[in-house]
Amino acid sequence: MIFDKQDLTALFITLKLAVMTTVILLIVGTPIAWWLSRSRWRFKFLVEALVALPLVLPPTVLGFYLLIALGPHGPIGGLMEALGGRPLAFTFTGLVIGSVFYSMPFVIQPLQNAFTAVGRRPLEVAATLRASPLDRFFTIAVPMAKPGFITAAVLGFAHTLGEFGVVLMIGGNIPGTTQVVSIAVYDHVEALEYTQAHWLSGCLLILSFVLLMTVYGINRRFSVVQA
Amino acid sequence: MTIEARFHIDRGEFSLNADLAIAGKGVTAVFGPSGCGKTTLLRAIAGLEYNEDGYLRVGDQIWQGDGQFLPPHKRSIGYVFQEPSLFAHLNVQRNIEYGLKRIKGAAHKASIDPTIQLLGIGHLLNRRPSQLSGGEQQRVAIARALASSPDMLLLDEPLAALDDRLKQEILPYLESMHRELEIPVLYVSHSRDEVVRLADHLVLLDNGRVQATGPVGEVFSRLDLAITHDADAESVIETTVAGYDEAFGLLRLDFAGGHFSVAASPLPAGRTVRLQVLARDVSLTLAHQQATSILNIFPATVDQLVQESDAQMTVRLMAGPVPLLSRITRKSTEDLGLKTGDQVYAQVKSASLLIP
Amino acid sequence: MEVLIPKRIQLSLILALTVTFCAGQVLADEIRIAVASNFAEAIKEIAERFEAKTGHEVILAYGSTGKHYAQIKNGAPFEAFFAADVERPKLLEDEGRALSGSRFTYAVGKLVLWSPKPDVVDANGSVLNTGDFRFIAIANPKLAPYGKAAKEILQARGVWDQLQKRIVRGENINQAFQFAHSGNAELGFVAFSKVKRPNRAVPGSFWQPPQSLYSAIDQQAVLLKSNATARAFMAFVQGEEACTIIQSYGYGTL
């Protein structure tokens, strides 16, 4: 095995980051996606644009703003320090925060689409069958939106696996804490260690491809069943 | 139990202005042309259309009024939508149990087996909605609505999305439901056929306003309403089975104004049967004809006359307390010298049983 | 009274001016130089003096030495390469991509431990041992000579292992400086040239470790194309005027 301990650590950190980011986004993103799919507020488009922003912003821009925000002079970092905590630059927590912003649209948009596809009728029906709003959400909307949840989870996970620009800005490349695979590959190439670069990159490529195959496979299966 | 409702709902180009009282028993049909606001009214009663300033009292509960608005999931209703709206991710059994599982304790009334029997869906319980026909889906939807033991059943044109064959398949179920249910039923429809077969009371709606309310037989005979002036003007008469003439295959039906003899299969005595008598099948004579092929002749008083056109007149008669419509030529009215208060004999050439 | 300039002299004047003007245009050359990030400001001043003197244009591209090396290997069109180490120019020379014999040391990098805040780093660098900080920034030792030097110093002071989780690695010396400068890392090993400016005191606090603690960071340059202007530039860089500039920016010269 060509992997050395540091590379394996990088893989582990990357997977840990992807899992945590995905879980947080599913928890936080579901109510947002639900609101977006139900609301008829005329300024909803502002929120949708905000959510979509990380899709088009260069990751380095996002990383730059995060670095300022998380640093000791920034709003979040300053607040943390005032509360007796530590600033978040160069910490795994800081990476998680950055990844949550970075992968946000990849989780919220599929969820929003899936909730919209559920439509109003099933929920009205459930209301006439004594289901409270929360009950309707969990017993009708969520199960009917299952393909959306799977897509959101897989896309959020896979997207975080490939994160580079944001981590480059706020990660600090600390092995065992913030050194993720994409940075490790970059460093290997810079240092002319092509073999290791090949192994790590290949690993990530296969993992990403398998994940994407899963998404498309599942969605195909679901659309066939509901036909 | 009575139901009192007052709604004023503006939906852009359309507005509903309804003020009505609904009987707490039997089937009340909300009848009118498409787009007149029937569905909006039903949804408002169910709480699905949030509106300000409405008023709704059901029995002794105020569901809306004085700034209160009871959300739909707190109202004891069963609602059947126009398109079959079964939950695609649950099988038939779980669909039916959905509302049942959510009513608490004492409200947990009798089991759902009788309902399943009544609607003939026992053999479908393990299937998924996508495997059912439109008619089967609607029957499941009705069972589902009833399973939660609601105090009121609301049906929004449940047959509209079905083709004729499926409609005919379900109507009998609806009719037996009508006989068996003890809760008020609100039935929205634009189909005269359905209304005449199923309704006890009628709310006539047009352009967002209530035109008339009352027992179905009475509303259908009111000459101040447009429905009595088209070619299909009819009378709806409630009768009771009195006997059966086996030799001639005739069913004898008693009503408050006399009795009918109708060619039909036997039915148990005492059973109520609704008769549909088209106005154009009713002719009038001043003297009781003796040697005539028409079996159904009874005395009646002329109540009202309305000219339909140069040639046609509609006459409203009272056979005892029961109204009856007759469509004859204007010439005949003049020849017979008909006017309000005259005693005549109504001759009904044919009558259809609406409930077999 | 009119002053008449004889026609012949007029013509000669015009000709002379034209020739000089054209000569200036024809001879004005443009050279591209890849420069290690840390040397950016010094080279800028040097290039400006050169341009003023000779009329040639010097186009500078800043970046990490590793990246430049890879680009040059793949045919990037630079006339000369100012690296932050010795290794890359040597490799290019060995691989035949640089003119042999043109390699020379143009500056000696000096490393300092620096903090933008006045009382953080004392003149002996004992803050390294007290460990009174959350993060310390260095350039990535695998990629940058300054980073390698920082590692050597930390190892010499015996704190490399225990500080592992607190050492933040910048992709290049500039990012390391940015981490320290922004306060995200309280202090960092940066190029002296980043904080030393001509005619100004160094802001914040710093410790200049003795050269014996770390491998010399000879920064070497090499010619990539046989170009007269480029040669002239290289000569200029080794001249006295350039050396003064180089030293005022915090480098040593040979």
Give each language-model segment a name.
Chain C
Residues 101:
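Active-site phosphate-binding/coordination module
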Residues 11-22:
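Bacterial N-terminal signal peptides
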Residues 27-55, 59-62, 66-76, 83-86, ...:
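Exported/periplasmic ABC-transporter solute-binding proteins
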Residues 2-13:
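Bacterial N-terminal signal peptides that target proteins for export
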